[in-house]
Design a protein with these regions (language model features):
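Feature for intrinsically disordered/low-complexity regulatory segments and propeptides
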Residues: 1-130
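Intrinsic disorder/low-complexity polar-acidic segments
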Residues: 121-174
Length: 174
């Protein structure tokens, strides 16, 4: 069994994330990237509220920013590692020269995704809310492992009533 969280801990974390996450729809001309000492941050400029939101950029959002702007991943990564100011200059230039509306998904002060405005939001909380009641109705089902990471939610459930012998002496439960 893989170690992770208990089902209760997973539920607590998903509820916490649901409460603190925020999604922004912004014109890229209102997004500015800056290279800091050891990380990158983006500033979301919000003229209506006269307040800017400053966020660290995670690896997933970096990859999506590069893809959105048509910057090859290898070159993006090279600039990110070797010349951060050049990367910021390139990204900011392309944000202004090829404007589009993008969704910036955030969690805990981090830009965790940079997506199309048409992206359909399905959060881990919603998935758990739909799946867990069904699992609870399965007699003898047990959660073997569960975890939520920056990229995915994992939930492994074993139903001992569903089993088969894949080879002599090797029984697998589903």
């Amino acid at each position: 069994m893989k170690h992770g969280r208990t089902l209760t801990e997973l539920a607590i974390e998903l509820d916490r994330q649901r409460k603190v996450k925020k999604d922004y729809l912004l014109d890229t001309r209102n997004v500015k990237m800056d290279a800091m000492e050891n990380f990158f941050q983006i500033t979301l400029i919000n003229d209506e509220q006269r307040a800017n939101t400053i966020l660290r950029v995670n690896d997933i959002a970096h990859r999506q920013i590069g893809s959105t702007l048509g910057i090859p991943a290898k070159y993006y990564d090279k600039m990110r590692a070797e010349n951060p100011d050049l990367l910021s200059t390139n990204v900011n230039s392309w944000f202004n020269e090829t404007p589009s509306v993008r969704m910036v998904r955030t969690l805990d002060g981090t830009a965790r995704a940079f997506l199309s405005e048409r992206y359909r939001r399905i959060d881990n909380y919603e998935i758990a809310e739909a799946v867990l009641p069904i699992i609870a109705q399965i007699p003898d089902a047990r959660v073997a492992s569960c975890e939520v990471t920056e990229q995915r939610m994992y939930l492994k459930v074993v139903n001992p009533r569903l089993e088969t012998e894949v080879s002599p002496g090797d029984v697998v439960q589903s």
